[in-house]
Amino acid sequence: MDQSRRRWLQRSGALCATGLLGSWPHLASAGTRAKAGAFGPLEAPDAHGVQLPAGFNARLLASSGQFVRGTDFRWHAAPDGGATFATPDRGWVYVSNAEVPDHQGGVGALRFDSRGEIVAAYSILTGTTRNCAGGPTPWGTWLSCEEVANGMVYECDPLRSGQGIVRPLLGTYWHEAAAVDPKTGFIYLTEDDQEGRLYRFRPQFYGQLDTGILEAALVGLDRTISWVPVPTDAPYRGDDSTAFARGEGAWIAADNLYFATTADHRVWAYSIRTSHLEVIYDAIALGEDAILYEPDNLTMHAQTGALLVAEDAGDLQLILLAPRAGRWEAVPLVRFEGHGGSEVTGPAFSPDGTRLYVSSQRGRDGEHGMTFEITGPFLGLTRKS
């Protein structure tokens, strides 16, 4: 990232720092920059502009508007949030949202056999608007979220072609991501708006989203969160809740909810057990040492506990955040060179943790998205340099 843009981002982040969360203490846990990547520096870009460390390789799987190889299915425009799901035949499915306006969005799916080869491609949702991120559920469905003022969440079956079911009780607002607590079935939802809220849906019955209560987070002075019941028919902006500066990706692991806010360049961790909230990465606090700006989609490598965070813009990187010695270390894992009009979207690992799926939303020409599979020694993600 050039220095003028970095300074502009720092100023814009400071302008966002105007409320309770803006004045959040710059804690020691707000991240640190690694001297070198866990696998060494990124190498020269490949033919598609993908930069990876030594030992990693990228394969282009699908391009917007083109038939997925071996199928009669055209890949959608603007691929965004994604996830993988295991299949009974030891394969898996990768789903990808289409962030397209005017009811032209939806969700596409790539099905792989046990060897990692594509055997089918199909749609699991159509006719929706700006499907941004979302999240997988423990019961095997995909929650696809619309990022518009009247946005809704749709629950989709990833394993077969079909149409999702709208879930209005999850709220009507600028939806971004959804993360489900596997223990309780509670769903945590982010909102991509400058005055967005962090929401929680408490279903009456585990895995059933047609009854339950929607709540918004209120952050106390002691950095603990309490939850306030809110209506479901419009974005909530009550004074009894806390604004987050454009909520983005979300993921739950080991009783912690991790989520990003792109306007103030932060990644957060909320302890579901203790209700405590903390900042684990803060680009503004790090200043010139920061390498991750405008954090967006995120996912976790289940086998190692490493957190991967995609940049909305910035240097078009996928950044590894890994806990070491009580701090979160940030290192680049993927960078897209020559994709200046794009953003990094949809990171998700195969169920066995050996393959990473990720997209350049608008590709090298600024119009046609590119979805990749990256292979390499991912099981060493937490290894020190």
Describe every region a protein language model picked out.
Residues 8-385:
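Sequence/structural signature of beta-propeller domains
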Residues 1-7:
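N-terminal secretory signal peptides
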